[in-house]
Amino acid sequence: MTENNEFDVADLRREYIRGGLRRSDLTENPLELFERWLKQACEARLPDPTAMCVATVDTNGQPYQRIVLLKHYDDQGLVFYTNLGSRKAQQLAENPHISLLFPWHMLDRQVIFLGKAERLSTLEVLKYFHSRPKDSQIGAWVSQQSSRISARGVLESKFLELKQKFQQGDVPLPSFWGGFRVKFDSVEFWQGGEHRLHDRFIYQREADAWKIDRLAP
């Protein structure tokens, strides 16, 4: 793109000096280490520490990625919510395999979950939906996610219309809005290290236990 060498991405580099990750730092259950790192990301005041890159694949094998917010996690899996007509929801209906990446750049860390996504029950979705701010609930009605629109004004007009409609009482749950639980069987932790000698550990589920291996950077 540039011939005068004013900007070359190959020259953008830095050392990773925030410390390493040793086997003695690991927990038996990867979710415990994930929770520790997530809390540290929050304490470090990282912007959107629960933001994760969600990767899905369409029927042609074309991968897609987008940023989504984590809303719950436990031993059963990681939970996020979305419009069920969205591209990611449609792709997960065809192929439930999914990857989640948490990029905590300021801490030189990332965590990758691999697994399968399954739809949440209506009761679970309803409980979360009504915990959201009312304007966010209305916003769920406004957006037919991933559909083509002529202008932003279309969304804003629809929002004002529905805000008036739902001014009194509760906002009902849209039939096209739901959530997914990612049941993971692989978790990789990456910690940046000096001289590009990064630390990587992968947890892989084996029956009722987790097998842990160190990976070359």
UniProtKB/Swiss-Prot annotation:
Substrate binds at R13, R14, E15, Y16, K71, Y128, R132, S136, R196, L197, H198. InterPro entries: Pyridox_Oxase, Pyridox_Oxase_CS, Pyridox_Oxase_N, Pyridoxamine_oxidase_dimer_C, Split_barrel_FMN-bd. The keyword Flavoprotein applies. Its cofactor is FMN. Keywords: Flavoprotein, FMN, Oxidoreductase, Pyridoxine biosynthesis. GO terms for biological process: pyridoxal phosphate biosynthetic process; pyridoxine biosynthetic process. It catalyses: pyridoxamine 5'-phosphate + O2 + H2O = pyridoxal 5'-phosphate + H2O2 + NH4(+); pyridoxine 5'-phosphate + O2 = pyridoxal 5'-phosphate + H2O2. Its EC number is 1.4.3.5. Pathway: Cofactor metabolism; pyridoxal 5'-phosphate salvage; pyridoxal 5'-phosphate from pyridoxamine 5'-phosphate: step 1/1; Cofactor metabolism; pyridoxal 5'-phosphate salvage; pyridoxal 5'-phosphate from pyridoxine 5'-phosphate: step 1/1. SUPFAM superfamilies: FMN-binding split barrel. It comes from the Bacteria. Binds 1 FMN per subunit. FMN binds at residues 66-71, 81-82, 87-88, 110, 145-146, 190, 200. One of its GO terms (molecular function) is pyridoxamine phosphate oxidase activity. It is an enzyme of class 1 (oxidoreductase). Catalyzes the oxidation of either pyridoxine 5'-phosphate (PNP) or pyridoxamine 5'-phosphate (PMP) into pyridoxal 5'-phosphate (PLP). Belongs to the pyridoxamine 5'-phosphate oxidase family. Homodimer. This is Pyridoxine/pyridoxamine 5'-phosphate oxidase. It comes from Yersinia pestis.
